[in-house]
Every structure is written in C-alpha cells, then in structure tokens.
Regions:
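Generic structural signal for bulky hydrophobic/aromatic residues embedded
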Residues: 5, 59, 96, 148, ...
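Rieske [2Fe-2S] iron-sulfur-binding domain
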Residues: 12, 19-27, 31-36, 41-48, ...
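C-terminal catalytic domain of Rieske-type non-heme iron oxygenases
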Residues: 18-20, 85, 160-387
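Short, small-residue-biased leader/transition segments that mark boundaries at the very start
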Residues: 1-2
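Serine residues within intrinsically disordered or low-complexity segments
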Residues: 5-6, 24
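Acidic, Ala/Val/Gly-enriched low-complexity intrinsically disordered segments
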Residues: 8, 15-16
Length: 387
C-alpha cells in the first residue's frame, strides 16, 4: 500500500469522508479535564497492541550482521536473507538461551554462537552439530516481517490476523527528495511520544530556543478520515523555523505563509507536513516548498521506546553541510522532548498512586484523545483493557 503524507489535491482541500469537531465537541474535550475524566493511556503497563505492524528497524541496520532489538517487551533478532529480504526470530536459542543475535547468518539460516545450532526462517532447528539427531522440540517463535520503503516492519501478534500491508513512505527513497533521518531510544512509554508529536501547541514553549516558532499556541482542526487521525492549521505570515530554512534555501527572517498538515494512519507512524509559500521569492527562485516530517515509535522494554524520525524536503539534493546542520538542529529539538518525556515517565512511575490522580485535558489535546480512543479500541479487539 502506497501512502502519501501530503494532501495531493491542493492546499485548501476540503475534508472528504472526515468529520471536523464542532464547537460542542471541542467543549466536551475541554470539560473532560474539569470533570476529572480521562481516557487511560496505560503508560505504566503493557499497552502494546499486537495485531498491527510496528517498525522493527531501518533497512540499513540489518545488512551487515544480525540485529538484536527488544520489541513489545520481547527479544527479537532481525537479519537479512540471501535474496535481501528480512527475517525475524525470537532472540534466544532454546538449548541454553544464548542470544542468536550474537551468531552469524549462513545462507538463510542463523547459527547460534554457543553450540552452532542452526535455525530456519520458521524458527525450526535444522542442525545440531554435537549430535546426529535434531531435537524436534528445538523451535522458537518466528515473526512476519516486511520491508516497506526504508523500514523493516514486524507483526508481533496473530499472523492469521494480518489484514493489511505496512505503510510505505515513498519519498524516503525518492531521488527527487532529500531525506534526513535519525533514531533515538527514549526511556518513556511509546504513547507519550505518539501524543507529543501530534501536539503542536507544546512547540512554542518546550522548543522556544530550537524551533523558535512562537505562533503555535492555538489548537489545529482535528478530524478523522476513515481510521486516520488528521489535523490541519493555517498560519499568518511569519518567519519560518530556522530548523528548516536551510533545507528550503529560505532566509530565517523572511515572512512566510505556511499550512501545517498531519496524519496518523496507524499508531506506529505519523506524518507532519509543512506546506510553505513564499509570496515574494527572489528572481529565479521557487515560491512553494514542502517539508514532510515522519515520526515512528515502537515499544521496546517496559517504559522504553524506539523512536525514528525523518525530515524530507522536495529538493533533489541538499549539500552535506546543510544536511548536517539541519540534522543537528532537529536532534537538539527532539532531545528537549526526550528529556521532558523521560522525566515525566520516571515521575509518574515512582508515584505509589500510579495513574490514579487527576489528568486535565485541554481543547488542544484533540489528536491525543483520538490516539487514546484508537489504542483502547485496538486493545479491546484483542480482548484486553486498560480500565
């Protein structure tokens, strides 16, 4: 399935099959905090839906040797087969529990580093060098994986429940785009990151020294298109954040018109597009640009998460200097998120009351509320609850 994160039919595209929140609905969201009500997010427990695709790795991470990665509190080994396709197994040999990720790949088999036992992509032991017979009980879980775009996706739940392909982000490997990306491990529950990247109003405060975009103080329009959470917001003329000026070749002090658009097609991935318009471009220069942000989050161990981010510019090539400068600036901003979310997680986890205290919800939390509703629905479909 090919997913394009930008609205393809124009900047002022009307919402089709989507519902924008009415004034009464926004008041309802605001009143949730006043009444002490909230939708649980399960940030201290196992709040990971299994029957969905999660990103396991960037494709480049598994090309040279097996990769060990904790996913949904499960040790997984990811490796590449002879034809270049990915494979994933439980990262523990059933003999004496050595991590298979410390072994090596031989053909399409992964070899345990401890006693040389070999396992196929189905998790079956095909060879035990220290004896003639292969024990038929020597099996480990295997997980469906698929490469889509630049990422390897994994399905940790029931394989029979797979009903879609993972999201493919075409511009990440499109030569007409310049793509900057990074990864960090965050000591916070994944849902905190997901809510954070869908909340634009924190940027004017938490990122006042990095984004330097102080007009992000009002709530965007939040609506649904099918099962996709969407938001959109138009801004008056103002200088663009210095994080992205260099990538677009724009001066940091020039008033620019921009439209912010976001989509979350699944809990695992969301997109934030900057549609930028320069009303008075210099001679021979473009007037319109697009910057596409990508936010991928996958649960790791309890209270820890994997976070991949990307920033793509609709410019065929930017210099290494500009790419390095932009990446350093983005990392500095995201480290501000990381530091705050990690302290938030630690503070709540240390409180003996757990989650049993008031959480106020503001009108600007519309997208975050949608995240929690979707999360609780998916867990309910799997026979689980956070209540």
């Amino acid at each position: 399935m090919l997913f394009r994160s930008s609205y393809e039919n124009g900047r002022n595209r009307k919402v089709e099959n989507g519902i924008r929140p009415t004034g009464s609905e926004m008041n309802k969201v605001e009143n949730m905090g006043k009444n002490g009500q909230r939708i649980p997010n399960g940030m201290l427990v196992d709040n990971y839906p299994r029957n969905m695709w999660w990103v396991a790795a960037h494709r480049d991470e598994i090309r040279e040797k097996p990769l060990a990665r904790w996913i949904l509190e499960t040790p997984v080994v990811l490796y590449e087969l002879e034809d270049g396709t990915p494979a994933a197994l439980y990262d523990r040999c059933p003999h004496r529990w050595a991590p298979l990720s410390e072994g090596h790949v031989c053909g399409d088999k992964i070899v345990c580093p401890y006693h040389g036992m070999e396992f196929d992509t189905g998790g079956n032991c095909t060879k035990a060098p220290t004896q003639h017979m292969t024990p038929n009980t020597a099996q480990i879980p295997a997980y469906p994986v698929k490469q889509a775009g630049a990422f390897i996706w994994i399905w940790m739940g029931d394989p029979e429940a797979i009903d879609c392909d993972p999201i493919e982000v075409d511009y990440q490997i499109d030569p007409n785009w310049s793509f900057i990306h990074g990864y960090m491990e965050v000591a916070a529950n994944w849902v905190l990151i997901r809510e954070n990247v869908l909340d634009l109003t924190h940027i004017a405060f938490l990122h006042k020294n990095t984004f330097k975009q102080d007009d992000w103080i009002t709530a965007p329009d939040v609506y649904m298109e099918g099962e996709t959470v969407c938001y959109q917001q138009q801004f008056d003329l103002a200088p663009l954040s210095p994080l992205f000026c260099a990538g677009m070749g724009l001066p940091e002090d020039k008033p620019i018109k921009r439209v912010q658009k976001g989509r979350m097609p699944t809990l695992a991935i969301s997109f934030s597009d900057w549609d930028v318009h320069d009303a008075n471009p210099d001679p021979g220069c473009r007037s319109d640009f697009i910057m596409r942000g990508c936010h991928i989050v996958t649960p790791s161990k309890r209270g820890k998460s994997h976070y991949w981010w990307g920033a793509a510019f609709d410019v065929p090539s930017i210099s290494e200097e500009v790419a390095a400068k932009t990446k350093a600036s983005v990392v500095a901003a995201f480290n501000e998120d990381k530091e705050l979310l990690q302290k938030l997680q630690a503070n709540v986890a240390a409180d003996p009351r757990g989650l049993d205290f008031l959480e106020v919800t503001l009108g600007a939390d519309g997208a975050g509320i949608k995240v929690r509703q979707i999360l609780n629905k998916k867990l309910s479909d799997e026979g689980r609850t956070l209540s």
